[in-house]
Structure formats: structure tokens, C-alpha cells
Design a protein with these regions (language model features):
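Structural alpha/beta surface segment adjacent to cysteine/selenocysteine redox centers
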Residues: 16-118, 193
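C-terminal cap of thioredoxin/glutaredoxin-like
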Residues: 2-3, 8-30, 102, 106, ...
């Protein structure tokens, strides 16, 4: 019913990751979690993101900082923007989500918290080790797993798929495969779309 394409390197994705779970629980539908590399999307079809980071519009940048703080307060999440390391290389973390499969949600949540709430560099093996230990994952098979070619290929395939389906960033959310939404602030529309879909089942 709901597909959630995500990269933990985005604060807006952290908000959406947090907010979509109670929405899905309320409506009795499942979320299919699809890890991606948002940098791969930017490199392929949305390179203007890099230009806007290099030469931001001051007024817009100030407002975006306020907007993020407002959403974080409303959601009850601690988000430091920008983190000390930004942008961050999230490839190992996102491969970890792929490797964990149906068990990825606690790991993804811990990665979001480590990066956005605790200002830890999630590109570092030491941080990933700590995150694994915190939630009861053995680091040794974790690091072996994320090095497997099949895991690397699946992460790339997820990223290529969301682009092919019209996505341009993270989070990209689909209801019933074709109805696409982008961003945390689309939750009311996603809720309406799911309700309409349930009516027509």
C-alpha cells in the first residue's frame, strides 16, 4: 500500500520516517521500506541541489532552518541542522538497511537519531558499530553483509527505480505503486490517498 524510499542523510526524511509509521498503524496498512542513495539521484537528475547549497538564497535559507525547527518541535524530534559533517556519506548505513531487510526499521531509526539527534558521523565504521551494538546487531556480520555485491547492487537498483518512477529526492512515497508524494509535509495527502484506496478495495 505505502512504499517509502528514503536516505537517512536527509532531515526531512527523518521527520517523514517518524510520522508515517503512526499514520500506517492508524489506517492498518503496511509500509514497504526502500533504502536509496539520494546523492545518486542528485547526480543523475537533480544537480541543482548542489548549486543551491553553494550559493543559497539567504532569506530562503533562514526560513528553511526555522521551518525544520518548527517541524522538529511539532514532531518531538531532536534535529541539529546542519550537523558537523554535512552532507554525509550514508552509503554504508543505507547498505545496512538493505542487508537487514524486514528488520531494518530499528537500525534506520538509530541511524537517524545518531546523525540528526546526536551529531555523529554515520559514515564512520566506529559510529556504525556503536549503532549496531545499541540495538543488538552483531557488527561483524553487519560489516560483512554490507560488503556483499548483491547488497550494493540492490541499493543501486532501488535508487534507479525511484528515479524511473518519477522521484527526485528523499523521502519519496508511493501509495498503490503510482501515486507519488514527496516530503514530510505531504502526510495529510498521503492519509487521504490511503483512505480513498481502502474504500475502493
Amino acid at each position: 500500500m505505502i512504499e517509502f524510499f528514503f536516505d537517512c542523510s536527509s532531515p526531512w526524511t527523518y521527520l517523514a520516517f517518524h510520522n508515517i509509521q503512526p499514520l500506517a498503524d492508524e489506517l492498518g496498512v503496511e509500509v514497504t521500506w526502500r533504502p536509496i542513495l539520494v546523492g545518486g539521484i542528485f547526480n543523475t537528475i537533480n544537480p541543482t541541489v548542489y548549486a543551491s547549497r553553494e550559493t543559497p538564497v539567504p532569506q530562503k535559507a533562514r526560513y528553511l532552518k526555522k521551518d525544520l525547527a518548527d517541524w522538529a518541535r511539532s514532531t518531538g524530534l531532536a534535529i541539529k541542522m546542519p550537523p558537523t559533517v554535512f552532507p554525509v556519506n550514508s552509503v554504508k548505513a543505507m547498505r545496512g538497511c538493505v542487508w537487514l531487510g524486514n528488520d531494518m526499521v530499528p537500525f534506520a531509526r538509530a541511524i537517524f537519531e545518531a546523525y540528526w539527534g546526536e551529531d555523529q558521523d554515520i559514515s564512520q565504521d566506529s559510529v556504525l558499530t556503536h549503532v549496531c551494538q545499541r540495538i543488538g546487531i552483531d557488527p561483524a556480520p553487519f560489516f560483512a553483509g554490507i560488503g556483499e555485491q548483491a547488497i550494493k547492487d540492490q541499493l543501486k537498483a532501488n535508487t534507479d527505480e525511484v528515479v524511473a518512477r518519477g522521484g527526485f529526492g528523499s523521502p519519496t512515497i508511493f501509495v498503490d505503486k503510482t501515486d507519488m508524494y514527496f516530503g514530510n509535509d505531504r502526510m495529510p495527502l498521503i492519509r487521504e490517498a490511503v483512505l480513498l484506496s481502502l474504500i475502493h478495495i
